[in-house]
């Protein structure tokens, strides 16, 4: 006898953790709540998060927590859209619907093929592996300067002194942001992404002002690239033509290239670097292991990315009715893919809660999966590597000097500040 098919209303009644609301940002105020998702992974297949007082848009959403389920959905871009679906006016990759002017259908991570694929091809020459490799010397020097300055202090906020400083330098150099503008842009982005004073779907005065200032700067910057283009990623977006007769990018799409490159380039790498050092603080044996065997660097980078999962989830929207297992996901319903949960799934990983820099089987999802995987992955890895190389050469360990101050967000697993004392080698 076949199983009965269950729709979202019925599945909402079966939500296994009635006291847990994944849209309550307090749940994420001390980092990603791994125990909650360990409990959710015990339940096979699709779960439906019921509507609560906090869920945006007055509706619930599907939740996928297991590695293999998430991989399959992330690769099915025809059924699960990054832009939107059904009769929605907005969409995007966050739980809350974003209006069209905020990105869905216009920003690369909220686009669908064929335009998404054509945009990736257009801007990819600005961030090829060869081009990233050519940045190694200058990034190594910049990392060295940041580390040396930090080591002169008795204690330091590792996030602002090192973890944020190199990504800011790297992405600004890649795009061509003037040196004097960099820290102001960083402050605007922080204001937009920090949910310390609001809930999902809400805005605050600081976030509104940050967004307005950031986008106004972006408009001006894009126009300057239109007048004086180079070979950088924004210039390619402004001057280039999409393949297959899709024409030029619209002005909004051009602006969104600037926006997503700056935000993703700063936020994701900063969080991975800071979270990686926190992992080494909690697992000092792994720092010693990496000091003794530099050949573990690549696997260490992958383990840091798996462990930190800087972007915990992405959302898709169903473009048609589809049955997965015994669940009916209907056209227009929200579907969330929790990368951070997949990265601790014991049906894929052996001992997923062990921080093991020599881990061999580690096809982590920190950069996403499928056609929407992160274009800047190699740059992020390079930034992480040059910082670690300097620290490994001069530091035998780290000690926390106070509590870790986490960003209150379910979309970014980030550390706002982290006071650290270095155990210097000499």
Predicted feature residues:
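Cytochrome P450
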Residues: 1-426
